[in-house]
Every structure is written in structure tokens, then in C-alpha cells.
From Swiss-Prot:
The keyword Transmembrane applies. Pfam families: ATP-synt_B. The chain crosses the membrane at residues 5-25. F-type ATPases have 2 components, F(1) - the catalytic core - and F(0) - the membrane proton channel. F(1) has five subunits: alpha(3), beta(3), gamma(1), delta(1), epsilon(1). F(0) has three main subunits: a(1), b(2) and c(10-14). The alpha and beta chains form an alternating ring which encloses part of the gamma chain. F(1) is attached to F(0) by a central stalk formed by the gamma and epsilon chains, while a peripheral stalk is formed by the delta and b chains. It comes from Acinetobacter baylyi (strain ATCC 33305 / BD413 / ADP1). It comes from the Bacteria. Disulfide bonds: none annotated. This is ATP synthase subunit b.
């Protein structure tokens, strides 16, 4: 009976030990485990939130980068259009200036031609008068007249 009584004594001691552990040891352990689980869950939630925030930030950065690229492309296009417009304006002005210079040169050449013609007319008239005077002052001689006309033609 000692074995049975020992077994019952051990069972009672074990029951007291379990009751003591349930009363004094178990609650702090459960609290520590719960706190640890809560911290881990909070950390995982924070990591998920940070991951979502990172994805949002990356999307926002991509949108801003795309907008900046579009704006830069638009500015470049505007600059190219303005450059083409300036080139076309310069070309038009150069063409107009060239036409004006050509017209002015033509007018100058026409004036010089008219002045030369007028001078030539005056010289021809003077030569004709000289020739007529010589013919009238000299005798009527066919060969002399022909020689004088050749001289007049050579002077022209």
C-alpha cells in the first residue's frame, strides 16, 4: 500500500504544483506570450503598411516623373517650333532684303545705262554736227565724205 499511498501523495503534490503554476507562473507567461504575439502582429502590420506606402510613393514618383518628361518634351517641342519660326522669319527677311537690294541695283544700273545713252546721244549729236560742218566746209568729194563717215563710225 505504500506504493499506492506514495502514488496518491505524488499526485496530490503534482496537483498542488500545477495549481501553484496555474495561479502564479502561468498568467505572466501567457501575458508575455500575448505581448510578444501583439508586437509581432504590430510589426507585420507596420511592414505591410510601409510596403503599401512604398508602392504608393513609387507610383506617385512615376507619375511625377512621367509628368516632368511630358513637360520637358513639350518645352523642347515649343523651342523647336520657335526656332523653326525664327529661321523662317530670318529667311523671309533675307529674301525681302535680297529682293530690295536686287531692285535697287537694277534701278542703279538702269540709271547708269540711261545716263550713258544720254551721254552717247550728246556725243553722237556733237559728232554729227562736227561732221556736217566739215562736210559743208569742204568741197563735195565722194571719197572724202566716205572717209569722214568711217571716222565718225570709228568714234562711236
Amino acid at each position: 500500500m505504500n506504493i499506492n499511498l506514495t502514488l496518491i501523495g505524488q499526485a496530490i503534490a503534482f496537483a498542488i504544483f500545477v495549481a501553484f503554476c496555474m495561479k502564479f507562473v502561468w498568467p505572466p507567461l501567457i501575458n508575455a506570450i500575448s505581448e510578444r504575439q501583439r508586437k509581432i502582429a504590430d510589426g507585420l502590420n507596420a511592414a505591410e503598411k510601409a510596403k503599401a506606402d512604398l508602392a504608393d510613393a513609387q507610383a506617385q514618383v512615376k507619375q511625377e516623373l512621367d509628368a516632368a518628361k511630358a513637360q520637358a518634351a513639350q518645352l523642347i517641342e515649343q523651342a523647336n517650333r520657335r526656332a523653326a519660326q525664327l529661321i523662317e522669319e530670318a529667311r523671309t527677311q533675307a529674301t525681302a532684303e535680297g529682293e530690295r537690294i536686287r531692285q535697287q541695283s537694277k534701278e542703279t544700273v538702269d540709271q547708269e545705262i540711261n545716263a550713258a545713252r544720254e551721254e552717247l546721244r550728246q556725243q553722237v549729236a556733237a559728232l554729227a554736227v562736227d561732221g556736217a560742218e566739215k562736210i559743208l566746209n569742204q568741197q563735195v568729194d565722194q571719197q572724202a565724205h566716205a572717209a569722214m563717215l568711217e571716222q565718225l563710225a570709228a568714234k562711236l
